[in-house]
């Protein structure tokens, strides 16, 4: 049986919001499998699914850029080791340079991006290595997405929340104000996809199994259990899909209703949350403090 560490219990508590002993027991029953332990706790406690895909742990920023003609745009997440470096002007400038580059060039993967040239003539990888040497931290380009509108009436809108959450949305109809509202809504409500048709069958089946197990414990007849499960699935889909969510600026109206009112539609979106799904090593806080102290000493000496 896998050893159940205090760090594992802490992580499961952060995901579920449940007590230490409950989490430890679930991890023991699941032989240390974090996902299986979360499912066990949800079945037993009726807890909701964790909205976040993972714990936000790594540092860095999200940068966005949209071309002047509004036809193309890009979102990129660049990671570093401490929040101190994430606020550094050179680091921020690098991230924004990448967003601009990705807007103008169709780049398919990280390898191609590493070999692409920035406006100063250096390759992205050369500039990244120089920045690592200058700032003394590992710097990585985690992910990026390029949007290219298809039709004359299509638009792009972006929103950055403290550079830690970034959104780019591709929509048709409406006006720039609608685009901004949609991007802000996505940042706040964090939908998984646009509509229920886009929810992965695997995710839906996992939720159905959990809801079925929860409902079965009620002891009610099978037909009532089936209706309970269908109702919970419908509610779940409304929570995770953009069209089903209540609009943040008017909760009495769903996003689907808002779009119908504006004769508009959402073609797709990208949502990045810095460090989502990346785990920090234990002791990172102390390391971050020491890194900041060391950086301050270097700046004072120079």
UniProtKB/Swiss-Prot annotation:
GO terms for molecular function: translation elongation factor activity. HAMAP family: EF_Ts. It comes from the Bacteria. Pfam families: EF_TS. It is found in: Cytoplasm. Associates with the EF-Tu.GDP complex and induces the exchange of GDP to GTP. It remains bound to the aminoacyl-tRNA.EF-Tu.GTP complex up to the GTP hydrolysis stage on the ribosome. This is Elongation factor Ts. Keywords: Cytoplasm, Elongation factor, Protein biosynthesis. Belongs to the EF-Ts family.
């Amino acid at each position: 049986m896998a050893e159940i560490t205090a760090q594992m219990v802490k992580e499961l508590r952060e995901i579920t919001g449940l007590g230490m002993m409950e989490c430890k027991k679930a991890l023991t029953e699941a032989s240390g499998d974090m996902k299986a332990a979360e499912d066990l706790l949800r079945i037993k406690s009726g807890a909701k699914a964790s909205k976040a895909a993972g714990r936000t742990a790594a540092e860095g920023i999200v940068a966005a850029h949209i071309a002047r003609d509004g036809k193309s745009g890009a979102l990129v997440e660049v990671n570093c080791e401490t929040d101190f470096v994430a606020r550094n002007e050179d680091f921020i400038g690098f991230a924004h340079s990448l967003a601009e580059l990705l807007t103008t060039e169709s780049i398919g993967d990280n390898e191609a991006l590493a070999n692409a040239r920035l406006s100063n003539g250096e390759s992205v990888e050369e500039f990244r290595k120089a920045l690592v040497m200058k700032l003394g931290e590992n710097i990585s380009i985690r992910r990026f997405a390029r949007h290219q509108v298809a039709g004359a009436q299509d638009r792009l809108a972006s929103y950055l929340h403290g550079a830690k959450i970034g959104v780019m949305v591709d929509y048709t109809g409406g006006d720039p104000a609608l685009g901004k509202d949609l991007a802000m809504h996505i940042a706040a409500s964090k939908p998984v996809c646009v509509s229920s048709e886009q929810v992965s069958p695997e995710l839906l089946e996992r939720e159905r199994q959990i809801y079925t197990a929860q409902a079965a414990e009620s002891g009610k007849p099978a037909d009532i259990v089936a209706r309970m499960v269908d109702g919970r699935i419908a509610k779940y889909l409304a929570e995770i899909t953009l069209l089903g969510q209540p609009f943040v600026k008017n909760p009495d109206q769903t996003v689907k209703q808002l779009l119908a009112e504006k004769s508009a539609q959402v073609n797709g979106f990208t949502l990045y949350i810095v460090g989502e799904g990346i785990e920090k090593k234990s002791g990172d806080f102390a390391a971050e403090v020491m890194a900041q102290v060391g950086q301050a000493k270097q700046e004072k000496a120079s």
